[in-house]
């Protein structure tokens, strides 16, 4: 059955939405193409008109998550343009952490992203995938923010702070205050 352009776009969105849900709740390994196609109401054979493989679909989800997170950081930096660099960057990091906490996407990133990237063809990674440091560097340059000990340390620190999202339960009810303390302290150190 041929799909109209509109149907194709709607089905692509539905596949992405369902895959993101499964990425967080089941994980990539436990999610099957059969399960995804049943959820969106298409035949298994039709799946391959949308994506070459399950991994390519999960990669599209990972790219969407990254784009959303960098959009959140970009918006926070733009909104806080009157603040000094430490507070401005802290607001961006906190916004990203809150987004990850609210969506549950950190489960997918921590549990499946590394395996997913290992399974992708090199040409796909070379064309489409950019590491966090590249994106963080672009945001810092866009807003003329210069960390005093280098972008590599700033990017590694941001990754470390973001990893606290996955330990929210262990930290307990004081997690929001702990996160703010860590983020503001790190940003003051990086941008003093």
Regions found by a protein language model. Give the residues of each.
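Hydrophobic/aromatic-rich alpha-helical bundle segments in the mid-to-C-terminal region
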Residues: 141-186
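Short linear capping/connector segments at secondary-structure termini
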Residues: 74-76, 109-119
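Basic, helix-initiating cap at the start of DNA-binding domains
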Residues: 1-26, 33-39
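Amphipathic alpha-helical packing segments from all-alpha helical-bundle domains
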Residues: 67-70, 117-145, 149-156
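Hydrophobic/aromatic residues within well-ordered alpha-helical segments
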Residues: 11, 54, 61, 65, ...
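Helix-turn-helix
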Residues: 22-56, 60
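An amphipathic alpha-helix adjacent to DNA-recognition modules
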Residues: 9-17, 30, 50-74
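Hydrophobic alpha-helical connector segments
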Residues: 60, 74-102
């Amino acid at each position: 059955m041929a799909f109209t352009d509109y149907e194709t776009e709607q089905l692509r969105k539905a596949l992405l939405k369902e895959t993101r849900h499964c990425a967080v709740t089941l994980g990539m390994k436990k999610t099957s193409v059969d399960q995804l196609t049943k959820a969106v109401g298409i035949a298994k054979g039709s799946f391959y008109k949308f994506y070459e493989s399950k991994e390519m679909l999960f990669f599209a989800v990972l790219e969407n998550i990254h784009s959303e997170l960098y959009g959140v950081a970009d918006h926070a930096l733009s909104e806080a343009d009157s603040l000094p660099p430490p507070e401005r960057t802290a607001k961006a990091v906190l916004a990203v952490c809150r987004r990850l906490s609210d969506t549950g996407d950190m489960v997918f990133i921590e549990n499946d992203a590394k395996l997913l990237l290992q399974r992708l063809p090199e040409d796909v990674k070379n064309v489409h995938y950019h590491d966090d440091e590249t994106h963080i560097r672009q945001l810092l340059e866009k807003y003329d923010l210069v960390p005093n000990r280098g972008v590599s340390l700033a990017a590694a620190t941001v990754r470390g702070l973001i990893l606290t999202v996955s330990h929210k339960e262990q930290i307990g009810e004081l997690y929001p205050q702990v996160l703010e303390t860590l983020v503001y302290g790190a940003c003051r150190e990086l941008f003093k």
